[in-house]
A protein has these predicted regions:
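Transmembrane beta-barrel wall of Gram-negative outer-membrane proteins
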Residues: 2-85
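C-terminal outer-membrane beta-barrel translocator/porin domains of Gram-negative envelope proteins
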Residues: 1, 60-198
Length: 198
């Protein structure tokens, strides 16, 4: 997988505690373990602001062109159906509560995050993506060692009765689940000759 992005950020937009960002991105995948390739190109502006002492709300928009190509004849019909290009136009929000640097105990704290993206404002994709994250951090042995634990989950629900595309689904990376090759963990179509990850 390869990716390149260019991000412009202004942490004090309009002279206030408003974090304005705009990201231009280009990502490709070409795994030896998969008989298809992907390319995604797009733009994603966002605006983040505090709504409490430890809470911030982020409002975002994403416009992306996702292309799936080089799908082989031995791939699952699920993958062959996704072959081609689709435009995603999505509005989203994310709320983050983080007291790791401002809580009563300066050596420990939590971070909680919940967000949703609503695709369907134009484009070809109509779905809702919901994500949640919870993390805990503490320092031990005279603050010489930092321990962190994080749990994260998400779901993508189609709003028009169509199946989600492979570019909209989740894949665990080697940072999240060690001991597996790229695309080595996840659902498969066992009836397909190559049994590619779906």
């Amino acid at each position: 997988a390869n990716s390149a992005s260019l991000t412009f950020g202004e942490p004090a937009f309009l002279g206030r505690d408003l974090n304005a960002r705009i990201e231009l991105f280009y990502r490709t995948t070409s795994y030896d373990q998969a008989d298809y390739n992907t390319r995604s190109i797009g733009i994603a502006p966002s605006l983040s602001f505090p709504i409490s002492e430890n809470g911030r709300l982020t409002l975002s928009y994403r416009l992306a062109e996702d292309r799936i190509f080089d799908v082989t004849a031995s791939s699952s019909p699920i993958l062959r159906r996704d072959d081609g290009t689709a435009i995603t136009s999505a509005l989203g929000y994310s709320y983050t509560y983080d007291n790791r640097r401002s809580g009563l105990d300066i050596n420990s704290g939590v971070v909680l995050r919940f967000g949703q993206d609503f695709a369907g404002l134009g484009g070809d994709i109509t779905n809702v993506e919901t994500t949640a994250l919870a993390g805990y951090q503490t320092q031990v042995y005279n603050e010489e060692i930092t321990l962190r634990a994080t749990i994260e989950g998400g779901a993508v629900n189609s709003l028009d009765g169509q199946n989600t595309r492979i570019t909209d689904r989740y894949f665990l990376s080697s940072r999240q689940m060690r001991g597996f090759e790229p695309l080595g963990l996840g659902p498969r179509d066992l009836a397909a000759p190559n049994q590619d990850a779906l």
